[in-house]
Structures are given as C-alpha cells and as structure tokens.
Design a protein with these regions (language model features):
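Class I S-adenosyl-L-methionine-dependent methyltransferase catalytic core
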Residues: 1-195
Length: 195
C-alpha cells in the first residue's frame, strides 16, 4: 500500500533505559518503547517517493536507525543540527548529558524511493532557544518545506497544527486520518523492531 505523504516529520517520544533520564521525559509526556514505535504503520503513510525527517538524541541514535528501517525508509544524512540557546539569555543551553554536557539534537533524513530536493541552499544548523520540554524549533518545518517543496506532508507526535501540515499526536486534534487514539490503544504488540 502506498500513502500520500511525500514528507513525514516526526519527533518520537523516545523511552530511555536510564531511569534518571526516563523520569525527566515521563514528567512531561507519555513515552513509547522502540517496539511500540516500530509497530506504528508509518510506512503506509509514505508516498512512493518520500522523505522522513526524524528527531533523535545522541543516546537514541541506534534505536532511531532501527526505527527508520522499520518505517520503510533508508537513512541518508543528518538534515538538521539544533544548537540550543538559553531561553532568557544569549548563552548556550547545556543539559546534563551522559558523558559530556549535552547541547545539540539532530534531525535525521531518510528516504523511500527517489524524492527530489527543491533547493540546494538550505543550511543544516538551527540556532534557536529552548522552549517547552522537548519542543523543537518551528523553523525546522520551514526548512523542510524549503528543501523539499510544498508537498503533501504530515507531522507525527505534533504539539500544534501548523498551516499546510496534517498532524497526529496526543497534543493535537488529528488531521492525518491515522488513528483515532494514542498508540497505546492502537499499536501492534507482537511487532518487534529490526536489528
């Protein structure tokens, strides 16, 4: 089955294995295991030629690459690197990190088929202040559209409904025609992620 979306933008609610880190995420939103994420029928949403833009933290990179394959895409590159500034000061934000004090997050780019980029002048860096916990810069959507063109697009795990985007997530009214409920009610429990 081929879907209609040529652009899929996702910020998965990663579940961390470290209890200290996991608690921080769980205080703000429900998280999902890698198997729960892999069970989502995202591959069915993707057009024959489509691009996936997916946020991942550095500790989650191995799981992010597994998820890309499970959703039917092939990893290509890091589309964007978000360098975080503090909200109220012109200085860099630093999280606790695992080995070093963390700052950046990456948005991975993966493809299915042969999507065409529409612009060659889109810069990888996004320098933007942090906002609500885990909220990504709105500028990312603009960069995606500039890079890929005004194509049918959906944002998964969305927190808002931006113009021109279909959305799905537990913080928005879904417009993507995916599932009527949050994944814990609609995922397939017998699916495991590819290694």
């Amino acid at each position: 089955m081929t879907g209609t979306y040529e652009i899929i933008y996702a910020d998965p609610p990663w579940r961390y294995s470290a209890k200290k880190v996991q608690g921080a995420a769980e205080n703000h939103y429900p998280t999902m295991s890698i198997d729960e994420l892999c069970a989502l029928p995202v591959a069915e949403l993707a057009a024959k030629d489509s691009a996936l833009f997916m946020w991942a933290t550095f500790p989650q990179l191995p799981e992010a690459l597994r998820l890309i394959r499970a959703w039917g895409f092939t990893y290509k590159s890091v589309a964007f690197v978000w360098l975080k500034k503090n909200r109220r000061a012109d200085s860099w934000f630093y999280g606790l990190g695992f080995w070093t004090r963390a700052n950046a997050e990456v948005c991975l780019l993966a493809t299915k088929g042969h999507p065409k980029r529409q612009a060659a002048d889109i810069h990888q860096f996004i320098i933007s202040p942090i906002e609500a916990h885990s909220k990504k810069p709105d500028e990312t959507r603009d960069k995606i559209v500039a890079l890929m063109g005004d194509r049918p697009r959906v944002e998964l795990f969305a927190r808002q409904t931006p113009p021109g985007w279909d959305v799905w997530g537990n913080e928005v009214e879904p417009t993507a025609g995916l599932w009527s409920r949050w994944p814990e009610d609609s995922g397939k429990e017998d699916v495991s992620c590819p290694m």
